[in-house]
From Swiss-Prot:
Alphabetized UniProt keyword annotations: Amino-acid transport, ATP-binding, Cell membrane, Membrane, Nucleotide-binding, Translocase, Transport
Official protein name in the record: Methionine import ATP-binding protein MetN
Database matches in InterPro entries: AAA+_ATPase, ABC_transporter-like_ATP-bd, ABC_transporter-like_CS, ACT-like_dom_sf, MetN_ABC, MetN_ABC_transporter-like, NIL_domain, P-loop_NTPase
Subcellular location: Cell membrane
Domain of life: Bacteria
Native source species: Thermobifida fusca (strain YX)
Top EC class, one word: translocase
Residue ranges of domain ABC transporter in the record: 2-241
A GO term, aspect molecular function: ABC-type D-methionine transporter activity
The keyword ATP-binding belongs to this UniProt entry's keyword annotation: yes
Quaternary assembly: The complex is composed of two ATP-binding proteins (MetN), two transmembrane proteins (MetI) and a solute-binding protein (MetQ).
Principal cellular location given in the protein's record: membrane
Positions of ATP binding: G38, P39, S40, G41, A42, G43, K44, S45
């Protein structure tokens, strides 16, 4: 659905070059929610602006829905952009227009007849849970409600792709959770492909099917969210989970997915006659999966066999130095 191929982007700033993107490539399958995370200045927002060609990359290609946007002439590019919606951290609503008027605005620009606009606006406000706010003005809305208006407006032209640039970073935790739940519902109901930029790991944990981690203009890690958590040395796992509370001989971290009901620790003590001390741990829901992580100290003559037993059962075992 979205393919970014070897993107490069350099800005000129006060007589010096600032490299924003260094050969960035990523693939977002149709119907997935794909997160791009990283620190400020990593190139995340530049990447997003290149996807819909608000910024044109110096080198590389952008493919959306089978079309190379970087090769399209202006009239065709404008038409292709109608299939790409975008929501922002700052809602950019028109204060002089009602909620319904804001949602209708892109349809007016596109020349959609008034009766059809009204039907579409009513449908969208129902979809985002604001059917009773059609006549309200932005100043009368909460931050979460304003973002819902922004989402409805982005969906007005019936896009197949939604780009989200830090859309929840200005919201409180409860409102953030409700917006993320809405995005997940839209993804499922409409088959919407969502590419979201965030610096919040809780966003990745809650809704992202796959993720790319960026740093200094490059993608340094990418893959399915759950698969990365089972990958030794994963940057994502280090970011999502607190570091082990202790280290030393026999101390390991155990990570497993969707195995919370298996009595793995009691099996170890029973089968291999080892002592297992639990030093810390957590059970989190990540991308719809139950992911567990324990830090334990295993001692006994058969401790190596016990660790092999865990590995054979798809538990990631990592020594804590």
């Amino acid at each position: 659905m979205i393919n970014a191929v070897d993107l490069h982007k350099v800005y000129q700033l006060k007589g010096r070059e600032v490299v924003a993107l260094r050969g960035v490539s990523l693939h977002v399958p149709q119907g997935e929610i794909y997160g791009v995370v990283g620190p400020s200045g990593a190139g995340k927002s530049t990447l997003l602006r290149c996807i819909n060609l608000l910024e044109r990359p110096d080198r590389g290609e952008i493919w959306v829905d089978g079309r190379n946007l970087t090769a399209l002439p202006p009239p065709q590019l404008r038409a292709a952009r109608r299939g790409i919606g975008m929501i922002h951290q700052h809602f950019a609503l028109l204060s002089s227009r009602t909620v319904a008027g804001n949602v209708a605005f892109p349809l007016e620009i596109a020349g959609v007849p008034r009766a059809e606009r009204r039907r579409r606006v009513a449908e969208l406000l129902e979809l985002v849970g604001l059917a009773d706010k059609a006549a309200a003005y932005p100043a009368q809305l909460s931050g979460g409600q304003k973002q819902r208006v922004g989402i409805a407006r982005a969906l007005a032209p019936r896009p197949t792709v939604l780009l989200s640039d830090e859309a929840t970073s200005a919201l409180d935790p409860a409102t953030t959770a409700s917006i993320l739940d809405l995005l997940r519902d839209l993804n499922r109901e409409l088959g919407l492909t969502i590419l979201l930029i965030t610096h919040e790991m809780d966003v990745v944990k809650r809704i992202c099917d796959a993720v790319a981690i960026m740093d200094r203009g490059s993608v340094v890690e990418t893959g399915r969210t759950v698969d990365l958590l089972r990958t030794p040395g994963s940057l994502l796992a280090r970011s999502l989970f607190a570091p082990p509370p202790v280290s030393g001989d026999g101390v390991v971290t155990l990570t497993w997915v969707d195995q919370a009901e298996e009595p793995l620790i009691s099996q170890l003590t029973r089968l291999f006659d080892v002592d297992v001390s639990i030093l810390g741990g957590a059970l989190e829901e990540v991308a719809g999966h139950a992911v567990g992580r324990l830090t334990v100290r295993i001692t006994g003559e058969r401790s190596a066999e016990a660790l092999t037993y865990l590995t054979d059962r798809n538990v990631l075992v990592e020594e804590v130095p």
